[in-house]
Design a protein with these regions (language model features):
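N- and C-terminal low-complexity/disordered segments
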Residues: 1-101
Length: 101
């Protein structure tokens, strides 16, 4: 039997090339509101949820001991297939769990 619950979040997985690409695509959106420029912006791990598109919850290393948790919605191809940042949490650490917010 599968551990996946329809509409539920996956378990935390190690980030891959696709996750890093999503981070690169949304980096400007993340930097806009706090007007910060992150020299480092590396996806570490993520969770996902299939809805009318895909929600991603991504842990991003931004330098030193600093991490962000990002909520990103990836639209379906019929809706332009773009990624939109729907939430950012600052002041996280390496061992903080990814909890949907």
């Amino acid at each position: 039997m599968s551990d996946v619950i329809c509409g539920g979040w996956t378990k935390t997985k190690k980030a891959d090339e696709q996750t890093q690409k999503i981070c690169e695509n949304v980096k400007n959106q993340v930097e806009e509101e706090p007007q910060k420029n992150y020299a480092e912006f590396h996806a570490v791990e993520y969770r996902s949820q299939v809805v009318a598109g895909i929600n991603y919850l991504i842990k991003v290393h931004v330098g030193g001991t600093n991490y962000l948790h990002l909520m990103v919605f990836h639209k379906l191809p019929c809706n332009a297939g773009q990624e939109v940042v729907t939430g950012v949490q600052e002041h996280h650490h390496k061992d903080d769990p990814l909890v949907p917010f």
